[in-house]
Amino acid sequence: MTRRADPAQATLFDDDEPAGAPTATGGFVPLADQFDALPADWKALLGPCLARTDWPALCAFVDGERAAGKPIFPTEVFHALHLTPVDAVRVIILGQDPYHGTGTVDGREVPQAHGLAFSVPAGVRVPPSLRNIYKEIEAEYGRKLSAGSGNLEGWAQQGVLLLNTVLTVEQGQAASHARRGWERITDCLLEHLARVGHARVFMLWGSHAQAKRALLPEGHLVLEAPHPSPLSAHRGFLGCGHFRAANDWLAAQGQSTIDWLRPQAD
């Protein structure tokens, strides 16, 4: 089962407006309202995590930054959770914080970040780390990816959760929202996700992601490699074989595999 357009999310955002732009009511969408618009399965999983953390303080910080006129990316903070139901998640690829830069689509400047780790909106130039991810997939399968887009919503629709450990960032300020409360929430989400339903694949690239291994109980496939950044990809990410390994393991578990050569949505 996959999700396509989510009516609750669609009512919050206008796709014709850039990230951080005012809504039809003249303001941004508060973070708490974005949580309230989540599908019921993710609200049930994430709700206890918010109760264990200082969620009101995080909301006040993010909303306050936006109210002050700072461009905060992405607009749709929980976009990844709208695309893949909890029970459909078979692979988790863990990122760090959202892209803090912008790209150009049809002459318009847009944020690179759109709520999925490593992914960018269609039309935005594919970032270097994602180019290395594509390069590894092509090497493993001996085929070129057909599309040049960096939008990974097709993977999300197949059951790949592309999750950053920090879900917001200020434009041009890398890690500007780190240590504001997101890490405790996403740690809790990972722990809960690892303890419900079927076994899953966790791809942990780089030391930041690998530090989360302690959150994961036995029974899952945990794949570790250096980060796909150009600074580290040649130290073991390229040649890691993670994508075929994930599919081999999923097939052995009786689960559907991922078509890694189809990153874009249908």
Swiss-Prot record:
Enzyme active site: 97 (proton acceptor)
Compartments, record wording: Cytoplasm
Keyword DNA-binding applies: no
Entry EC no(s): 3.2.2.27
Highest taxon in the source lineage: Bacteria
Region (Disordered): 1-25
Molecular function via GO: uracil DNA N-glycosylase activity
Pfam families in the record: UDG (PF03167)
Record GO cellular component, one term: cytoplasm
PANTHER family xref list: URACIL-DNA GLYCOSYLASE
Role summary: Excises uracil residues from the DNA which can arise as a result of misincorporation of dUMP residues by DNA polymerase or due to deamination of cytosine.
Name of the protein: Uracil-DNA glycosylase
